[in-house]
Amino acid sequence: MERKYSHIIVIGVDGAGSWFKDADTPNFDRIFKNGAVTYNALSSKPTISAECWGSMLIGVGPEVHKLTNRRVSTLPYPLWSKHPSVFRRIRRAYPKAELGSYCDWNPITKGIVERLMGVSHATARDKELTPLICDYIRQKKPDFLFVHFDSTDGAGHKNGYGTKEHISAIGEVDTLIGYVHSAAQEAGILEDTLFMVIADHGGTNPGNGKGGSHGGWTDEEKYVTFAAVGKGVSSKGIGEMNIRDLAAIILYGMGIEAPSFDEKGWTSQIPKGLFTEYDGVYRDISHLTGAAERISREHHKSELL
């Protein structure tokens, strides 16, 4: 299978839901003007960070990977799992690839990305993390880089999701997205990069001043933003999409054959209309139940290492 891109950069924006469409995001709008954008990508059940980021980076549902916020905060993801992350799959295909995981919420790197994979990593709050990300891109020109920004989820928990404070936080992260995109341009890799932004979940706004939560399956919680730009990305519109499809998209871009579709395992697919040269089957997975529902009412607690 032919490798489509020399570089793939994914920026995850925690708790942003579909509200990119409502925020002041000049960088997002500029970057993805000729790319593919949807505000209706479907999250994973329950709409909680570990379940969602796990699905995106592993390509299976929460009922299969069984990750929770507590688990990823305390246990490393096993090297022997029969459901490896995209980092492990890329490392197997390209032993010398430069891989990076730069996350505000450090349990993603500690509990979803396998150890001993030679993955460059750093953690800090969004604004402090961004210069580290940009330096890494300029110096190392990574084959695959995953970035996680978390301030948006914090704003949702504190003020309610979809409030002016939450939407303002998305606008602030838009500035950081612009810096990361500019770093790829300065590194001379942008023309051969698949550049993506994705949210994991949205959240609720009870309107009582006590802040929002997520974990349920309301429209405000389950529909999220996804955007992609790069050579071969269509601008005509994306069909049905689940956030777990990110894993299949990454493997396709890297030229790595994805596992066969299996409702008890790999359920990540490439959405119709995303790539001009891809026209595969997209299966309905709406009947898959996900993991047991629970509600997250507090912002992440993550040590900075």
Per-segment meaning from a language model:
Residues M1-L305:
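Feature captures the catalytic ectodomains and active-site-proximal regions of enzymes
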